[in-house]
Amino acid sequence: MADSVEQSSVTTKRISAKGARKRFVGTKSASGKHSQGVDRVGSAAHRPVNQIPEEILKDTKLQEALPENYNFEIHKTIWRIQQVKAKRVALQFPEGLLLFACTIADILESFTGCETVIMGDVTYGACCVDDYSARALGCDLLVHYGHSCLVPIDATAGIKMLYVFVDIKIDTAHFVESVRFNLGAGSCLALVSTIQFVAALQAASNELSKDYQVEIPQCKPLSPGEILGCTAPMLKDKDAVIYLGDGRFHLEAVMIANPAIQAYRYDPYDKTFSKEYYDIDKMHEARQTAIKQASLASKYGLILGTLGRQGSPKVLQTLEKQLQSLNMDYIIVLLSEVFPDKLKLFKDVDAWVQVACPRLSIDWGTAFPKPLLSPYEASVALQSVAWQQSYPMDFYAYSSLGGWTPNNESNRPTPANRRKKNLHTEVIIDNVSDSKPVIKESECGSGETCCGKCTKETDKHSSTP
């Protein structure tokens, strides 16, 4: 439900889908070859490794091929393809950017001579990065458009990665004036958006700070101001939160996490400013009912999402351990998409837990005949954690509540510079007569270079570093 708030009349420039789909025609050299013949050696011999060549940056055909307010970072992409000498490049777009796919593919092929593959499977968010499919198709490089690097580039073994956020320029002045027109000066505001608008958010913050107490919150590893549909910060001492972006999916995440704070939305496309509402009590009631039903289940079904990197094996293992500790019967099912009719086929399963997208349970849980829980809700049902009065929207946050989230400290890989850390520090041990501290085999990272000051034992004694 949204209350439209009066705004000045401003003409919105629309992008023609027809124009975006036209084929790119590159310039030709005297030899009749396309621009892909850009000198890769010559002047590059004295050029810093990461500097984009001038002949790419100043190419007028590139500058005119795509909307000027959408930054597809074409120059950087061409240079990256040349850097890694990629022969086959996979391009992955969210639904809203697919209309530019053919044009971008033509540009990249014309300027680099590579072969491009447009990946057409649905891409809901940054969690859907499909490096597995790209690698299976023999691609050397995957370019993922429209989302931040939720999956680190060093985690995609076997294929190079490039993230293009697609920064979108908006009428920042109109956004700022819309806030001033509707909210009283001196208010404490939090500004959030999707990755496409974080630059505009920073610019707007600088202007709004003259009249308001403005914060751009950060939920690491996300960028300042960035929110996802499953990950949003908990805010303190704020009069309002303003979301810059279209649609409500991402906005609802921050509304669920902060039900007591009034939310507003500014749509940069139609330039409207609206007051937004979310029935948090109805949502809580529905989720608690599902949890209560699942707590009585005799057999669980664990769903691991296979749409890109959506499913987390670490989270799945955490849930398995919880069920095993309770001697619960369960099965594991791999699914790229979760539909009610599919789950109906498993008649002996009493409750489902999906390790894919928490919003699937929140938004669509009531559409399933059996309880469909998120990992957090399953942990409540299995009594591993208490129900939180503020529903946690921390699925990809480093500061998440527990091991039912992928980036929780218990699930993150140990940094390389800490893996060999020697644990020979002060150790306090009770009821041990031997003067040497007892450290478990798995805790000593020294291996054969161990100093011998500890006794590697596996016994009932416990140590507290």
UniProtKB/Swiss-Prot annotation:
UniProt biased composition (Basic and acidic residues): 454-465
Molecular function per GO: 2-(3-amino-3-carboxypropyl)histidine synthase activity; 4 iron, 4 sulfur cluster binding; metal ion binding
Major enzyme class: transferase
Enzymatic reactions: L-histidyl-[translation elongation factor 2] + S-adenosyl-L-methionine = 2-[(3S)-amino-3-carboxypropyl]-L-histidyl-[translation elongation factor 2] + S-methyl-5'-thioadenosine + H(+)
Highest taxon in the source lineage: Eukaryota
Positions of [4Fe-4S] cluster binding: 127, 230, 357
Species the sequence originates in: Nematostella vectensis
Biased composition (Basic residues): 15-25
Function, in words: Catalyzes the first step of diphthamide biosynthesis, a post-translational modification of histidine which occurs in elongation factor 2. Dph1 and dph2 transfer a 3-amino-3-carboxypropyl (ACP) group from S-adenosyl-L-methionine (SAM) to a histidine residue, the reaction is assisted by a reduction system comprising dph3 and a NADH-dependent reductase.
Designated name of the protein: 2-(3-amino-3-carboxypropyl)histidine synthase subunit 1
